[in-house]
């Protein structure tokens, strides 16, 4: 099982760089490309409810993915950047991210299955196959992305949290020692 893999000291900065770039790739390139190909492959000239639902489902998925990735970019990465500076937010930790982290690649599987099952075969079948191929690749890419988050990024951030907490405890003890010496001197 992946949870039994030994901890390896990884660069949290390199992981965040990879994850941020992956977010931009998905949101700014891969998904817009799929949508463009999807529009080319489906027949929007007819009043086809399946076509409308496929587009609506895809657009809803993209919005959900944007929300998910923007949360990570704005909150999770900011939290980790502060940790790297030795600043620990007492109201947040990486376990909160883990508890709320949903795997958004499942909806792509649903979309692919809806297209395969309900979209009528037409003269643009090759184009739709290209769309399905892109969706399949996105599924795999997002699954890999989630594995990097779950099995590399989260354990690395947990280790960083531990180090920052230990450092804060050590600094607190060191700060209290001179006070104790002063109190002993003044009581004598």
Region spans (language model):
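Small-residue-biased structural context
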Residues: 1-188
